[in-house]
Amino acid sequence: MRRSRLAKILSLASLACMALVIGCGSNTAKITFVSEVDGDAEIFVIDPDSGISTPLTDNRSSDRNPIWSPDGKLVAYVSDESGDLEINRVDRNGKLVERLTNIPGDDEAPLWSPNGEDLAFISHQDGNAEVYLLPMDSRKAIRITAKDPDDMLGDWSPDGVWLAFSRRGSSEERGLWLRNPDGVNLVHLTEENDSDPRWSPNGKHIVFVRVTDGNSDLYLASRLKDGTWQDDVQLTRLTQHEEDDLGAAWSPNSNTIAFVSFRDGNGEIYIMEEDGSRQLRLTTNEADDLEPVWSPNGSRMVFVSHLYGPGEIFIMDHDGGNQRRLTTNSAEDYSPDW
């Protein structure tokens, strides 16, 4: 009887862990970030509950832009160890480091596909910034864009069918673009000074930054009623202020967008509904609060605050409550991913 009761308790505890997606050894419960505490930029992970941090890299090079793989077992990042910027990956324990790219020119902005089988990135090997795809099985990089204006990588669609990126340049080239890496389709979605496209987890919308007369605002592109993405996509303006609004991040349920606004004189973190309504300020101080990232279950956010001078890693509840400082050093900490 006692054994049966114990088994039931352990089973319930296991289910609770899965439901919360935090604690109980969940890989994605930890936050990865960059710290310059040792004099150069290194990749760390930190437990959001205990505040205990562990270095994943420890070398003489600068390691930046960490991003978790979808299964939470690996972190891809950018390293200048070879002299050029290259894409590396490290396991969640920091024991296995692999260089993924080794080609002339800088490689940057790694972005895992939703199934973790491919890594998109930007390469400068041909003289300008182009989007490449690196299958994890073959490790042979494939060029998927080929234009003179530099490309800036944005986001994968949740189903892995499309890659969103942006370009500068003339009206014929600038704006948001969609490319299906497995095919030949290329969609010129917008034709303005647009960048930083972020796909909603439900796949219905793309939030992005539009710069008009030097001012950044957030817009929403929504797919057509037939479920396709075309150049006559529906656009909705989400913010309209004299100061910049940028750095958008979708909640896991696609209902809420976190973003950074400078409407108060410095960068503060806000949230709003997907249609731009109910804009609510979550942080309030005279320092910049930047880079909001949602926890996997949407209950919390990690962000970077300059309240104490250099950037430090903080967390808070999804409504701005229970704000807590995770890193406490005199160096810069930034680029969190949860």
Name the predicted role of every residue range.
Residues R2-S11:
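Bacterial N-terminal signal peptides that target proteins for export
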Residues S11-V21:
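Bacterial N-terminal signal peptides
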Residues C24-W338:
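Sequence signature of WD/YWTD-type beta-propeller architectures
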